[in-house]
Amino acid sequence: GIELHYSGMPFVRTVMQEKTNDELRLFIVLSLGITALILFLFFRSWTSVVVPLIVISVVVVWVLGTVGILNYKITVLTGLIPSIIVVIGIPNAVYLLNKYHQEFAKHGNKIKALSRMVRKIGMVTFITNFTTAIGFLVLLTTDIKLLKEFGLVAGINILATFVVSIVLIPGILSYLPAPKANQLKHLEFKIVGRFLVLLDLLVHRHRYRVFAATAVILTVAIVGVTKLYSVAYMVDDIPEKSQLKQDLYFFEDNFSGVMPLEIIIDFGRPKSTINARNLRRVDQLEEALEPLENVSSPVSIVSFAKAVRQAFYNGNERFYGLPSPSDRNVILSYLSNQSDNASFLSSFVDTTGQVMRVSLKIADIGSNKMDSLINHVIEPEIDKVFKDDEEISTAVTGSTLLFVKGNQFLIENLRFSLLLAFVIIAIIMAILFANIRMIVISLIPNFIPLIMTAGIMGYFGIPLKPSTALIFSIAFGISVDDSIHFLAKYRQELFAKKFFVPIAISNSIKETGSSMLYTSIILFFGFVIFVFSDFGGTVALGLLTSLTLFFAMFTNLTLLPALLMVFDSGKRNQNFHPLIEHYEFYIEDEDEEIDTQNLLIKENDPFVGTTKK
């Protein structure tokens, strides 16, 4: 039978949109499933699984509602947001539940445990959600509509996740029975406990080895960064084995590709496109472009006129060429008067007859080669033909050129976004801690994982392109959350232990370490699910973000406390307190005891209606 091959950018976009809709549903199910499984393995309690999932389900509905309210479409990027919200929102629940269980284990008072949970974790959770949102909201500084929509919807709903979490989780827990003994067993999880003890010993006894190992890893990563290169393909998101990609290869092999490139020639005067001299010039340009590799035969009014002349002489190949003076008037009259021809000609000549379009197709050879082909081959050929005539102006355009220039522009935009995220988060740290040393200490463990990931990209030949450059600001905004949680607890312990740094660090590792481990594991597996995507960019986003967050978990659990041990004296000016120390939940002794007996309604209370016995 006849084998059909489909291609063209409209067809490619349609197929990709259908796949995006399918993956939206797939990733929501996968993200909910994987987080539910991990929560159950950690907490061994259905309550600790169901409560977070209720919260996250509410926010997922909000995400889809936000997309609709803003009149956005579900794209390759916005389709990922529900799954990303699931993965990022669950750590809120982990920190809140862990604190609730820790407090309840101390005194067995549910109301007091809920109160302390909100007071001690609430503000820190807001700050961490805010820094995570910053990693997405900085994408608004780009001039790419797709990224702006992605950043805005994600940023808004990450902040909404905090609101829903801090309202619903304590509210639901207040109606549920107090935790039973088996629900608190995870606090004594021996494997996690031993691992945290090991980290504590490493920080206290071998911190300089931690620095040495970090320096070696960083050096190796920097060498990898030097091997990093930037290149993108117009359809590199499409899987290699898909029928769509095979059809694209067929068109590249047989028709030099499907990526459109247009040459616009303005002759400066109306009706000058049919001038014999101008037609010869365009013919000269087309003959120069014809033999180029990865470029299709040019199509314009010139190539059409040559084909009509051949048809006029009964298809004789000898007559394939521009009309001669003897047959020129007849052929041009035929071209102008036939309705089908007129419709065709309007695609290549404007209504004034002053501007002509020459259309080419280019193979998807990568942004670098495309840029070189356009700037160093095609444009010089155009200049060679038309440079002597000042009346004539030319321009190269089309989606291929937009892709090449847009890719370069986008990479620069994303670099600026990362820098902006870095600066904004540094300012937040400055407001919280009001100490330059603490700002530097908090940022180093989160900057090193970015360099490590960039190094891996260099060693494995993973190019820097929009889908991979995107991960750095996102991962940085997420990874800094662990630093904030650790430093917040560290500040609290400094007050409680009279500013004795070693004990403050040990207690901080013991109390926040398990939550940091749990949330990092959830984030790692939550982003890993994107490797099941059919889009190469989504796979890269998931894999590289997972790696970055995995590295950040270790740097925040080892390098951060080691830096504090060496560079933080623990001394504080008694008359000056940074913003983070102004909140009562940082001082253990200020916890107000809640007498649950006072919450009971007295039988003879005059303000309460009588009840029948």
Can you say where each PLM-predicted feature lies in the sequence?
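A short beta-strand structural signal in non-transmembrane regions
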Residues: 1, 5, 261-266, 272, ...
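Extracytoplasmic
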Residues: 1, 14-18, 296-364, 405
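Membrane-embedded transmembrane helical bundles of large multi-pass transporters/channels
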Residues: 2-233, 365-366, 384-613
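Juxtamembrane segments of multi-pass membrane proteins
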Residues: 202, 206-327
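Composition- and surface-driven signal marking solvent-exposed, interaction-prone regions
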Residues: 237, 264, 274-281, 285, ...
